[in-house]
Amino acid sequence: VEIYMSKKSWLLTLCMGAMWGSSFLFIEILLKTLHPFMIVFLRAGVALIGILLFLVYKKIKLPTSKDVWLKLMILGILANALPFSLITSGQETISAGLASILNACAAFFGVILSATFLSEEKFAINRLIGVIIGISGIVITIGYENILSIDIDNRGQYLVILATFFYALSANWAKIKLNTVDPAIS
């Protein structure tokens, strides 16, 4: 199967990667002057403004069901509040580079959890190999020296890894519980 991406798709992909990757650096800088939870609050607040502007621009209506709003609140906790708090707190004791490498664990957890909870997603060795290749690429890009800085007694590393578990869990939970909701909303 040949997969083609337009120049616009490549540009958007690069922009997303730059935004996501730079978030670790910005967290590291902001931790010098702000409390971790203030950083999380500001990060989520800026994102909320952007999402609301997007919804207004696209004329996407918000759901009216209390059940859907409850599920969206749970998703917000699993996909944003917990991971953002864990990563920001974790970065008090680890570098941005190491945090970004550990963040790649989300793909590993995603493969495991989707094979466990989603009937249409069966475990396949090629997916695991893909995750390993992806994590290897991140290690090469960010720098092998960051791997050497891993300290099993450093709680920050475990907090970032736990955050990646919540990213993977939230994606699987949303696919099960919010499969009828517009992805722009969820």
Describe the function of each predicted region.
Residues 1-15, 48-75, 92-93, 119-129, ...:
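Membrane-interface interhelical linkers
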Residues 1-38, 89, 149-176, 180-184:
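Glycine-/small-residue-enriched transmembrane alpha-helix faces in small-molecule transporters
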Residues 14-18, 41-45, 73, 77, ...:
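Residue-level signature of the transmembrane alpha-helical core
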Residues 19, 23-24, 52-103, 136-140:
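Specific transmembrane alpha-helical segments of multi-pass solute transporters/efflux pumps
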Residues 21, 29, 42-44, 72, ...:
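Hydrophobic alpha-helical segments, especially transmembrane helices
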Residues 33-82, 107-113, 166-173:
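Transmembrane alpha-helices of multi-pass small-molecule transport proteins
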Residues 38-49, 79, 87-126, 163:
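Specific alpha-helical transmembrane segments that line the substrate/conduction pathway
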Residues 51, 73, 105-107, 112-113, ...:
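Hydrophobic transmembrane alpha-helices of multi-pass small-molecule transport proteins
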